[in-house]
Each structure stands twice: as structure tokens, then as C-alpha cells.
A protein has these predicted regions:
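Class I S-adenosyl-L-methionine-dependent methyltransferase catalytic core
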Residues: 1-187
């Protein structure tokens, strides 16, 4: 697991040894960033962007954003076994000044209130069996976390059948092995 592009290109990231954590695979991550950079379906620039990385895990997505000149990443993670790895990856890449780690479970509406900013990109990578995606997307909308032209990127198991809020617009969906990635926004 590594940083694919940008100022930190080639830097290795620590990953957990347990099987409960499912780090974002390099091929999937590279495809996501190719879509962000080259899609004509939405217009978002990584340079100078504010990023919210929910269920951050090792921080692979957010750190890739920082490597590609994003302004700031807010990492949200509550799994106690992965938090030291997330913090080590941030420190080893000297990204502490451009990041914030929130150690919080975000499975209810009140937990979203501690997040004070608006974001250009919100990345959700919940555990594959997580059933509260609809509720999380509604909380993101109600908390006004996404900027007007921002996008939400969701990484899920491809067999998951998810419900989406009425105001959520799926822009693009791609499959990679056993996972799928959904790009969307609010209309």
C-alpha cells in the first residue's frame, strides 16, 4: 500500500495485520483519482480542496489527496486498533499540519455536529456490512457538510444493495473486483 502520485509518490503506508480492516486497494484508489481528475461529469479540483475522509482506516484516501495538493483532510475513525496506524501514517508523511483526526463513531446524527467545515470531497468507506449508509448520507446533507459543487465518493461491496436519499444524485458507478465505487452529489 503506497501513495500513487503527487509530492509523496511512492511513500509506503502502514496497514493493519488484522483481517477486520479492509484498506483501499491501490488499483481502486488509482481509478478513483483518475475519475476525479478526468471526468467530464463533474468538475472538482484536488488542488486546494477540503476533504472529509469518513471511516478513514489507514488514511490512504486522504493522504493521497494531500499528496496531490489538497488543502486539508479531516479524518474520522473510531476503530481503536487502526487509530495508531492512521496517526503514524499521517506523522510519517509530515501531514499533521494539513490534517485533523476525529476519533468518533459517526453512526448517528449528533456525531456529525462536531464536524464544522464544508468539504469539496467526502469519501465514505464504511465496513462492507454497514447498513446505515442511507442514514449517513442524510446526516451529511442535514449537516450541510458538502459544498455546492462538491462530490461524495462511496466505496462499498459490489453486492450491497443500498438505499439513497431522494436528493442524492448518482453521477457515476464503477466496479473493481468485489467492490464498487459510487460518485454522487446532492441536487
Amino acid at each position: 500500500m503506497r501513495i500513487i502520485s503527487g509530492t509523496l509518490k511512492g511513500k509506503k503506508l502502514y496497514k493493519p495485520k488484522d483481517l477486520l480492516t479492509r484498506p483501499l486497494k491501490d488499483l481502486t484508489k488509482e481509478s478513483i483519482f483518475n475519475i476525479i481528475t478526468h471526468s467530464n461529469k463533474f468538475s472538482i479540483a484536488l488542488e486546494g480542496a477540503n476533504i472529509l475522509d469518513l471511516f478513514s482506516g489507514t488514511g490512504s484516501f486522504g493522504l493521497e489527496c494531500l499528496s496531490r495538493a489538497s488543502k486539508h483532510v479531516t479524518f474520522v475513525e473510531n476503530y481503536k486498533k487502526i487509530l495508531p496506524i492512521l496517526k503514524k501514517n499521517i506523522a510519517d508523511l509530515n501531514c499533521e499540519k494539513k490534517s485533523q483526526v476525529i476519533e468518533k463513531d459517526i453512526n448517528n446524527s449528533s456525531s456529525f455536529k462536531i464536524i464544522q467545515n464544508q468539504f469539496d470531497i467526502i469519501f465514505l468507506d464504511p465496513p462492507y456490512k454497514e447498513k446505515k449508509l442511507l442514514e449517513m448520507l442524510e446526516n451529511i446533507f442535514q449537516s450541510n457538510l458538502l459544498k455546492d459543487k462538491g462530490i461524495i465518493i462511496i466505496h462499498r461491496h459490489k453486492k450491497e444493495v443500498d438505499e439513497f436519499p431522494e436528493k442524492f444524485n448518482i453521477i457515476e458507478e464503477k466496479s473493481y473486483g468485489i467492490s464498487k465505487v459510487i460518485f454522487g452529489n446532492y441536487i
